[in-house]
């Protein structure tokens, strides 16, 4: 019973990582606004593209681990990946974003990723 839940949550989260990466690649400025810190109109869009390609590539690593590795490897991946939304929480708070976005999106995502890691270690 626990295995489908563990893998299901991991699949959903990895798909979310891919979506975020693709969004930053396709529509970078709206993606930045959704992130919680709006991009400056005169700012260099290369940094948004960098974020997009890194998030998307990281999702491919997770997908490869899901497909070709074991649950513990995916658990370690999720544990390490949880650092990203945790630091995103701090970035949003330090750069003028709202607490609602910082905690409601980024911190909540970190909690979900940590739960996923725990579930993957448990199966």
Residue ranges and their predicted role:
Residues 1-9, 64-74, 117-123:
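Helix-coil boundary and interhelical linker segments in multi-pass alpha-helical membrane proteins
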Residues 7-17, 52-55, 75-85, 110:
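Residues within membrane-spanning alpha-helices of integral membrane proteins
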Residues 10-32:
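N-terminal signal-anchor/start-transfer transmembrane helix
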Residues 26-45:
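Cytosolic, membrane-interface loops and tails of multi-pass inner-membrane proteins
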Residues 42, 105-120:
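Small-residue-rich segments of transmembrane alpha-helices in multi-pass membrane proteins
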Residues 43-67, 80-83, 87:
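Core segments of alpha-helical transmembrane spans in multipass integral membrane proteins
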Residues 68-69, 87-103, 121-123:
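Membrane-helix boundary connector in multi-pass membrane proteins
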């Amino acid at each position: 019973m626990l295995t489908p839940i563990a893998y299901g949550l991991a699949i959903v989260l990895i798909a979310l990582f891919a979506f975020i990466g693709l969004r930053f690649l396709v529509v970078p400025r709206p993606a930045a606004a959704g992130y919680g810190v709006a991009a400056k109109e005169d700012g260099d869009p290369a940094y948004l593209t960098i974020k997009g390609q890194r998030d998307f590539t990281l999702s491919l690593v997770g997908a490869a681990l899901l497909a070709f590795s074991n649950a513990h490897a995916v658990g370690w991946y999720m544990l390490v990946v949880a650092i990203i939304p945790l630091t995103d929480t701090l970035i949003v708070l330090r750069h003028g974003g709202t607490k609602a976005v910082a905690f409601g999106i980024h911190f909540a995502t970190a909690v979900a990723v940590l739960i996923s890691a725990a579930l993957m270690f448990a199966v």
